[in-house]
Amino acid sequence: RLPEDEFAEHLKGMTKTTNRGIPIYIYANSGTPQIVTPLQSTTQANIKKFGQGMEIGNDIRLYELTNDAFQTLRSQYMNINIRPGSATLAIGVVVDGYLIGVYAFSAAPSVAQWDKHIETPTVYLLSDFPVEPVDYKHLAKLVLYAALSKESKRIAERITKRRAASLVTTAFSKNPESMKYRGLFKVLNRKHNDSLEKADWAKDIDPANAYYMQPYEINYGAPMGQWTLQEGLAIWKKKHSQKR
């Protein structure tokens, strides 16, 4: 829909063919306004969640999630403005039997060429998020340590049926760098849209596109398999286990 839509009074519907698809606006002289979007299948994950007042223990494991369970957790904990993508496999990060976060791989073909920036082949990190609320400031980084672990690398190689050398992902940010990935991932490239930095967010940006309409689009990459899950947990405890 255009900001200055001369047919706005005749807008009767909006639909999407996929969750990530562009909106299709329908105009008519009559009829009841409707919105039609794809239905997302969800189910509760049968696992306890980490929470406030709890301490991170020492037994860290990976737990493969069903797609429906992943959809539920993503809807519960992730930014609502991030459009759902299709995950090849979603993985829960569990410490002492409690879910502390989730990440997901996509094995879909990509036209991106990262061989000049990082070792290939690569696997795409579609999604990563911690559970909330918690007392730890940087629990999101523990999810990333798990995603980059030797155990995670083996899972990535199993689902892609090829070697997985590096993990790549994309962040949209108001700043030149995302603090979540800083220190673990390196910047592969960065796109800057100066017009978005100057945009009036109260009227120029559609809330449905808010997450993606940031001044910076940053592609990140990091080698996989540099530590085991236990080693990654130990590093996180040493560097990032500060509380709020």
Feature locations, PLM:
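Acyltransferase donor/substrate-recognition loop-hinge adjacent to the catalytic core
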Residues: 36-57, 209, 213-216, 223-239
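Short amphipathic alpha-helix that is part of the acyltransferase structural core
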Residues: 42-83
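Residue-level detector of beta-propeller blades
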Residues: 11-16, 99, 187, 192
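Class I S-adenosyl-L-methionine-dependent methyltransferase catalytic core
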Residues: 1-51
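A short acidic (Asp/Glu
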Residues: 6-11, 73, 102-104, 177-184
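Nucleic-acid-interacting cores, centered on viral/eukaryotic replication and modification enzymes
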Residues: 24, 61-65, 98-101
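Acyl-donor binding region in acyl/amide transferases
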Residues: 3, 87-88, 107-224
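Conserved beta-hairpin
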Residues: 87-107
